[in-house]
Amino acid sequence: MTYFVIFLGVCFMLGTLAVASNPSPYYGVVGLVLASVVGCGWLVNLGVSFVSLVLFMIYLGGMLVVFVYSVSLAADPYPEAWGSWRVMGYGLGFVLVVCMGMGLGGFVDFWKIGVTTVDSGGMSFVRLDFGGVAAFYSYGVGLFLVAGWGLLLVLFVVLELVRGLSRGAIRAV
Protein backbone atom coordinates (compact mmCIF):
# COMPACT_ATOMS: atom_id res chain seq x y z
CA MET A 1 0.00 0.00 0.00
CA THR A 2 2.89 2.35 0.71
CA TYR A 3 4.27 1.85 -2.79
CA PHE A 4 0.88 2.74 -4.23
CA VAL A 5 0.76 5.98 -2.23
CA ILE A 6 4.30 6.84 -3.33
CA PHE A 7 3.27 6.12 -6.94
CA LEU A 8 0.28 8.45 -6.52
CA GLY A 9 2.58 11.11 -5.10
CA VAL A 10 4.94 10.83 -8.07
CA CYS A 11 1.99 11.02 -10.49
CA PHE A 12 0.70 14.08 -8.63
CA MET A 13 4.09 15.76 -9.00
CA LEU A 14 4.14 14.93 -12.72
CA GLY A 15 0.65 16.38 -13.12
CA THR A 16 1.59 19.61 -11.38
CA LEU A 17 4.78 19.72 -13.46
CA ALA A 18 2.64 19.41 -16.59
CA VAL A 19 0.46 22.32 -15.43
CA ALA A 20 3.42 24.49 -14.44
CA SER A 21 5.48 23.95 -17.61
CA ASN A 22 2.68 23.98 -20.16
CA PRO A 23 3.35 26.17 -23.16
CA SER A 24 -0.32 26.71 -23.96
CA PRO A 25 -3.66 26.46 -22.14
CA TYR A 26 -4.54 23.62 -24.50
CA TYR A 27 -2.05 21.32 -22.77
CA GLY A 28 -2.52 22.62 -19.23
CA VAL A 29 -5.92 20.96 -18.98
CA VAL A 30 -4.36 17.49 -19.30
CA GLY A 31 -1.98 18.13 -16.40
CA LEU A 32 -4.76 19.67 -14.33
CA VAL A 33 -7.03 16.66 -14.76
CA LEU A 34 -4.15 14.24 -14.01
CA ALA A 35 -3.14 16.12 -10.86
CA SER A 36 -6.70 16.40 -9.55
CA VAL A 37 -7.57 12.75 -10.23
CA VAL A 38 -4.39 11.51 -8.58
CA GLY A 39 -4.76 13.89 -5.62
CA CYS A 40 -8.32 12.76 -5.01
CA GLY A 41 -7.22 9.14 -5.38
CA TRP A 42 -4.61 9.82 -2.72
CA LEU A 43 -7.30 11.17 -0.39
CA VAL A 44 -9.50 8.13 -1.08
CA ASN A 45 -6.57 5.89 -0.17
CA LEU A 46 -6.16 7.76 3.11
CA GLY A 47 -9.84 7.24 3.93
CA VAL A 48 -11.57 10.52 3.19
CA SER A 49 -13.66 9.54 0.20
CA PHE A 50 -16.47 12.08 0.65
CA VAL A 51 -14.08 15.00 0.98
CA SER A 52 -12.21 13.70 -2.05
CA LEU A 53 -15.38 13.55 -4.14
CA VAL A 54 -16.48 17.05 -3.13
CA LEU A 55 -13.03 18.52 -3.82
CA PHE A 56 -12.90 16.72 -7.17
CA MET A 57 -16.24 18.15 -8.26
CA ILE A 58 -15.43 21.68 -7.07
CA TYR A 59 -11.91 21.73 -8.46
CA LEU A 60 -12.69 20.32 -11.86
CA GLY A 61 -15.95 22.22 -12.12
CA GLY A 62 -14.32 25.53 -11.31
CA MET A 63 -10.89 25.32 -12.81
CA LEU A 64 -11.89 23.63 -16.05
CA VAL A 65 -14.31 26.50 -16.65
CA VAL A 66 -11.36 28.89 -16.30
CA PHE A 67 -9.30 26.83 -18.74
CA VAL A 68 -12.18 26.60 -21.22
CA TYR A 69 -12.62 30.37 -21.19
CA SER A 70 -8.89 31.00 -21.56
CA VAL A 71 -8.61 28.46 -24.40
CA SER A 72 -11.60 29.91 -26.22
CA LEU A 73 -10.34 33.47 -25.91
CA ALA A 74 -6.68 32.78 -26.69
CA ALA A 75 -5.93 33.04 -30.38
CA ASP A 76 -2.95 30.69 -30.69
CA PRO A 77 -2.89 29.06 -34.13
CA TYR A 78 0.38 27.17 -33.55
CA PRO A 79 0.69 26.24 -29.87
CA GLU A 80 4.07 25.13 -28.64
CA ALA A 81 4.12 21.45 -27.66
CA TRP A 82 5.63 19.72 -24.64
CA GLY A 83 8.46 18.33 -26.77
CA SER A 84 10.07 21.72 -27.48
CA TRP A 85 13.39 22.57 -25.88
CA ARG A 86 12.07 25.53 -23.93
CA VAL A 87 9.35 23.47 -22.25
CA MET A 88 11.82 20.66 -21.56
CA GLY A 89 14.12 23.21 -19.91
CA TYR A 90 11.28 24.44 -17.69
CA GLY A 91 10.42 20.86 -16.75
CA LEU A 92 14.04 20.01 -15.94
CA GLY A 93 14.31 23.16 -13.84
CA PHE A 94 11.18 22.27 -11.85
CA VAL A 95 12.43 18.71 -11.30
CA LEU A 96 15.79 20.02 -10.06
CA VAL A 97 14.08 22.43 -7.66
CA VAL A 98 11.93 19.60 -6.27
CA CYS A 99 14.97 17.31 -5.89
CA MET A 100 16.92 20.06 -4.13
CA GLY A 101 13.99 20.67 -1.80
CA MET A 102 13.75 16.96 -1.02
CA GLY A 103 17.48 16.76 -0.40
CA LEU A 104 17.58 19.81 1.85
CA GLY A 105 14.47 18.67 3.70
CA GLY A 106 15.94 15.26 4.55
CA PHE A 107 13.30 13.42 2.51
CA VAL A 108 15.70 11.42 0.33
CA ASP A 109 15.67 8.18 2.35
CA PHE A 110 12.67 6.57 0.63
CA TRP A 111 12.85 3.26 2.52
CA LYS A 112 11.71 4.81 5.79
CA ILE A 113 8.62 6.49 4.37
CA GLY A 114 5.44 5.21 5.91
CA VAL A 115 1.89 6.21 5.14
CA THR A 116 -0.89 5.14 7.46
CA THR A 117 -4.26 4.54 5.91
CA VAL A 118 -7.61 4.62 7.65
CA ASP A 119 -7.66 0.93 8.55
CA SER A 120 -3.98 0.54 9.47
CA GLY A 121 -4.64 0.58 13.21
CA GLY A 122 -7.56 -1.82 13.10
CA MET A 123 -11.27 -1.20 12.86
CA SER A 124 -11.50 0.61 16.21
CA PHE A 125 -10.70 4.02 14.73
CA VAL A 126 -13.46 6.34 13.58
CA ARG A 127 -13.22 7.02 9.88
CA LEU A 128 -12.15 10.54 9.07
CA ASP A 129 -14.82 10.73 6.41
CA PHE A 130 -17.70 10.92 8.87
CA GLY A 131 -16.29 14.06 10.47
CA GLY A 132 -15.80 15.56 7.01
CA VAL A 133 -19.47 15.12 6.10
CA ALA A 134 -20.58 16.88 9.28
CA ALA A 135 -18.10 19.71 8.76
CA PHE A 136 -19.20 20.26 5.16
CA TYR A 137 -22.85 20.50 6.11
CA SER A 138 -22.40 22.67 9.21
CA TYR A 139 -19.35 24.89 8.78
CA GLY A 140 -18.72 24.62 5.06
CA VAL A 141 -21.37 26.99 3.71
CA GLY A 142 -19.31 30.14 4.15
CA LEU A 143 -16.23 28.42 2.80
CA PHE A 144 -18.10 27.35 -0.33
CA LEU A 145 -19.34 30.90 -0.90
CA VAL A 146 -15.82 32.27 -0.50
CA ALA A 147 -14.49 29.56 -2.82
CA GLY A 148 -17.09 30.41 -5.46
CA TRP A 149 -16.24 34.10 -5.38
CA GLY A 150 -12.55 33.22 -5.44
CA LEU A 151 -13.04 31.08 -8.54
CA LEU A 152 -14.89 33.95 -10.21
CA LEU A 153 -11.98 36.24 -9.38
CA VAL A 154 -9.53 33.67 -10.77
CA LEU A 155 -11.58 33.54 -13.97
CA PHE A 156 -11.20 37.29 -14.51
CA VAL A 157 -7.50 37.20 -13.58
CA VAL A 158 -6.82 34.43 -16.11
CA LEU A 159 -8.77 36.28 -18.77
CA GLU A 160 -6.66 39.40 -18.15
CA LEU A 161 -3.43 37.37 -18.22
CA VAL A 162 -4.42 35.75 -21.49
CA ARG A 163 -5.14 39.17 -22.95
CA GLY A 164 -1.62 40.43 -22.25
CA LEU A 165 -0.50 44.05 -22.55
CA SER A 166 -2.65 44.74 -25.57
CA ARG A 167 -5.73 43.23 -27.16
CA GLY A 168 -3.55 40.95 -29.29
CA ALA A 169 -4.52 37.52 -28.03
CA ILE A 170 -8.16 38.15 -27.19
CA ARG A 171 -10.85 38.09 -29.81
CA ALA A 172 -14.14 39.92 -29.81
CA VAL A 173 -16.98 37.92 -28.33
Swiss-Prot record:
It is an enzyme of class 7 (translocase). Its EC number is 7.1.1.2. One of its GO terms (molecular function) is NADH dehydrogenase (ubiquinone) activity. Keywords: Electron transport, Membrane, Mitochondrion, NAD, Respiratory chain, Translocase, Transmembrane, Transmembrane helix, Transport, Ubiquinone. Its main location: mitochondrion. GO terms for cellular component: mitochondrial inner membrane; respiratory chain complex I. It catalyses: a ubiquinone + NADH + 5 H(+)(in) = a ubiquinol + NAD(+) + 4 H(+)(out). It comes from the Eukaryota. It holds the Pfam family Oxidored_q3. It is found in: Mitochondrion membrane. Belongs to the complex I subunit 6 family. Core subunit of the mitochondrial membrane respiratory chain NADH dehydrogenase (Complex I) that is believed to belong to the minimal assembly required for catalysis. Complex I functions in the transfer of electrons from NADH to the respiratory chain. The immediate electron acceptor for the enzyme is believed to be ubiquinone. This is NADH-ubiquinone oxidoreductase chain 6. It comes from Coturnix japonica.
